[in-house]
């Protein structure tokens, strides 16, 4: 388990773009992670998306999954951004949205390592709320030295 202070050691993102609040399960041997994002009405994006019917933007759900996958990648390599390595989100395959995410939801983020070739990492990711699927995708990240 990782609290927000440890997460901040593994992700360079900060408010309002840090989208992982807690890691509840991380297994390097099984190459998987489970984390969550508590979605609050105070999120800045709800001011414009949409004021009368607030919904978390899909691109931010994808980013949250990518951040969880990034933590897994750093843990697998036993590195941190402070060591001079970053993961850049470079694409996604098989992307699907199934249900909206609204204020008060706890967005569960799961990622499993698929492959790494020439510093291009691929993860199978899912996001859910209350056991209902919200989004799934293969997230592709590039490992880069600073």
Curated annotation (Swiss-Prot):
SUPFAM superfamilies named in the record: Thioesterase/thiol ester dehydrase-isomerase
Keyword Lipid metabolism: yes
One annotated GO molecular function: (3R)-hydroxyacyl-[acyl-carrier-protein] dehydratase activity
Keywords: Cytoplasm, Lipid A biosynthesis, Lipid biosynthesis, Lipid metabolism, Lyase
Compartments, as annotated in UniProt: Cytoplasm
Disulfide bonds: none
InterPro entries referenced in this protein's UniProt entry, alphabetically: FabA_FabZ (IPR013114), FabZ (IPR010084), HotDog_dom_sf (IPR029069)
UniProt-recorded name of the protein: 3-hydroxyacyl-[acyl-carrier-protein] dehydratase FabZ
Family under the similarity heading: Belongs to the thioester dehydratase family. FabZ subfamily.
Task performed by this protein: Involved in unsaturated fatty acids biosynthesis. Catalyzes the dehydration of short chain beta-hydroxyacyl-ACPs and long chain saturated and unsaturated beta-hydroxyacyl-ACPs.
Main location: cytoplasm
GO (cellular component) term, any one: membrane
EC number: 4.2.1.59
Primary enzyme class: lyase
Reactions this protein catalyses: a (3R)-hydroxyacyl-[ACP] = a (2E)-enoyl-[ACP] + H2O
CDD domains, per the entry: FabZ
Active site: 49
GO biological process terms held by the UniProt record: fatty acid biosynthetic process; lipid A biosynthetic process
């Amino acid at each position: 388990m990782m609290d927000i202070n440890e997460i901040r050691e593994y992700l360079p993102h900060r408010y309002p773009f840090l989208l992982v609040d807690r890691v509840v399960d991380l297994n390097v041997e099984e190459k998987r992670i489970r984390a969550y994002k508590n979605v609050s009405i105070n999120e800045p994006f709800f001011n414009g998306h949409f004021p009368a019917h607030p919904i978390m933007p899909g691109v931010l759900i994808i980013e949250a999954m990518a951040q969880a996958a990034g933590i897994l990648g750093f843990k697998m390599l036993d590195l941190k951004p402070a060591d001079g390595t970053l993961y850049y989100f470079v694409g996604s395959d098989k992307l699907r949205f199934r249900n909206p995410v609204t204020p008060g939801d706890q967005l569960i983020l799961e990622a499993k390592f698929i492959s790494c070739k020439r510093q291009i990492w691929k993860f199978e990711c899912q996001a859910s709320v209350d056991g209902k699927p919200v989004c799934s995708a293969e997230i592709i990240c590039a490992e880069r030295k600073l």
